[in-house]
């Protein structure tokens, strides 16, 4: 018998059955990552997160799932709907809570409908709609989903897209081979930035999560917090969660470190999927020219080349990434708005937004670091 369950945490779920549904090894929807955030204080109600996962069981075996959350705000999502919320509430509605299918705090494209067939994916989408209407919510949203999941959503869901800057491995054998594909100006600039970092006197390396000591995890987390403190934001990921990642994911966590007399003074933390490297967190207590680019981008590119990974996704936003070999790549989201008048207004606005974002892509590609320009994604 097939049953759909709604879960307020993943404690009752078999980790192996959950992870078996993730075809691409995406670490941000794996059991250890999602359950770790629940267990180690990252998903707090006062931060606006309440787990509301969907799980489909057949004869007591998990056959499909959707990580989902009731959201009391739009923070930590990176698909911005603040203007939608303001408009809906000015009209007298309650936009929050809403239902969100996502990897919390992670603007990373990946599977959001964890299933091995299209039928179960459509059941998950229907489940999101049913929960939205059962709870009397304003809306449901699914952010940063893969193209393979898009057909599961019918026309009632609004389509939205944006751009991130990703690096693609063209079979490079080493970093210099990558540089040869760039324009001369970009190649010269990257070499200069790498030289600045190497001449700093800092010990720079990529370190596997399984080798990081407890004291180094404390140092890494303190650097992560520093970045958020500088911007006046709260750092949601806790030190116990960082330690948990090192224990549970091991070498699927990689950290680019800069050390001074053995002490970590700057870092960039990465996660590794089957074919993709994901850049997530950066922090530093030193100001060294070129160091940010070395840790966040160039060591990551070298890691991808050495390990034959096909894609490097260094994080959301940042046009400066283009000058360092990253090209605009389309990301997708889907949105279900219950109120039909509100749906129509947003649907019309998204048509104009799409035209603007297509024009933005054309403008960006006029400044491609590669010659000749690559085909459109």
Enumerate the predicted regions with their spans.
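N-acyltransferase acceptor-side catalytic subdomain
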Residues: 1-377
């Amino acid at each position: 018998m097939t049953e759909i369950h709604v879960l307020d945490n993943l404690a009752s779920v078999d980790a192996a059955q959950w992870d078996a549904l993730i075809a691409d090894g995406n670490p941000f929807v794996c059991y250890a990552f999602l359950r770790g955030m629940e267990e180690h204080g990252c998903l707090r109600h006062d931060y606006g997160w309440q787990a509301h996962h969907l799980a489909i069981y057949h004869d007591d075996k998990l056959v499909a799932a959707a990580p989902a959350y009731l959201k009391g705000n739009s923070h930590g999502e990176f698909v911005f709907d603040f203007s939608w919320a303001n408009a809906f509430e000015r009209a007298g509605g309650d936009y929050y809570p809403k239902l969100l299918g996502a990897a919390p705090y992670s603007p990373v494209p990946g599977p959001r409908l964890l299933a091995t067939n299209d039928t179960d994916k459509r059941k998950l989408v229907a489940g999101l709609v049913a929960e939205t209407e059962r709870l009397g919510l304003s809306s449901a949203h699914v952010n940063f989903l893969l193209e393979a999941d898009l057909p599961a959503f019918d026309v009632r869901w609004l389509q939205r897209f944006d751009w991130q800057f990703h690096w693609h491995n063209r079979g490079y054998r080493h970093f210099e081979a990558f540089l040869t594909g760039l324009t001369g100006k970009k190649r010269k600039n990257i070499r200069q930035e790498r030289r600045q970092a190497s001449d700093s006197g800092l010990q720079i390396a990529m370190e596997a999560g399984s080798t990081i000591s407890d004291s180094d995890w404390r140092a890494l987390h303190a650097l992560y917090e520093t970045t958020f403190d500088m911007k006046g934001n709260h750092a949601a990921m806790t030190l116990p969660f960082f330690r948990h990642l090192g224990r549970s994911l091991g070498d699927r966590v990689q950290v680019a470190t800069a050390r001074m007399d053995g002490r970590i003074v700057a870092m960039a933390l990465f996660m590794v999927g089957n074919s993709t490297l994901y850049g997530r967190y950066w922090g530093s207590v030193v100001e060294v020219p070129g160091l940010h680019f070395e840790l966040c981008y160039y060591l990551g590119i070298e890691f991808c080349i050495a390990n034959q990974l096909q894609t490097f996704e260094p994080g959301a936003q940042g046009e400066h990434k283009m000058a360092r070999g990253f090209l605009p790549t389309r990301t997708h989201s889907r949105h279900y708005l219950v109120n039909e008048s509100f749906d129509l207004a947003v649907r019309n606005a998204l048509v104009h937004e799409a035209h603007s974002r297509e024009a933005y892509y054309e403008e960006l590609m006029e400044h491609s670091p590669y010659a000749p320009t690559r085909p459109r994604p």
